[in-house]
């Protein structure tokens, strides 16, 4: 890489067009998607397991990771990228790719040992909303689950309005087991 940087510096001294040439080279590289996807995957709380005490492997999490890498490499429009992750199963002509994109909602830490299925559902929704707020609004929504803050723009009523939408999303597999339905 350092050799490439040196070569770019030399080429740039000769011609300002070098910037455009090198930018195009970098953006058409398959490594472009890998590099920038890692930032999105951090925000989306990507991991190959659910973390926490159980640390159960998410056998198909890689599909979501590959979806994100491919989306960056294909220069997928941001609005489409977001819609597919939040409702890829509901878009017209939903495909395997758009359904895999909903892995965004499946990822993240979950206490799968929680014996109370309804509490587990609500905790998952809380985690999804908190991630949604941090990802798309740049703010935490978690506090509004319990109370209003004097200076926060999200009130409890707003929180539970959003939670109602996510409550209709099936993220729990077999209700008697309490296990996450892995996509």
Where do the model's predicted regions map?
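Short, structured secondary-structure elements
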Residues: 1-183
């Amino acid at each position: 890489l350092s050799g490439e940087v040196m070569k770019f510096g030399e080429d740039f001294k000769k011609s300002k067009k070098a910037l455009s040439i090198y930018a195009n080279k970098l953006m058409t590289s398959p490594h472009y998607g890998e590099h920038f996807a890692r930032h999105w995957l951090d925000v989306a709380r990507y991991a190959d397991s659910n973390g926490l005490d159980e640390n159960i492997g998410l056998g198909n999490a890689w599909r979501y990771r590959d979806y994100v890498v491919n989306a960056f490499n294909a220069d997928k429009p941001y609005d489409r990228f977001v819609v597919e992750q939040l409702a890829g199963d509901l878009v017209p002509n939903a495909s395997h790719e758009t359904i895999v994109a909903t892995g965004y909602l499946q990822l993240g830490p979950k206490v799968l040992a929680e014996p109370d299925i309804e509490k587990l559902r609500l905790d998952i929704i809380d985690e999804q909303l908190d991630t949604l707020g941090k990802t798309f609004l740049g703010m935490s929504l978690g506090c509004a689950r319990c109370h209003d803050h004097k200076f926060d723009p999200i009130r409890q009523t707003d929180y539970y309005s959003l939670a109602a939408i996510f409550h209709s999303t099936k993220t729990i597999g077999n209700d008697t087991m309490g296990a996450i339905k892995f996509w």
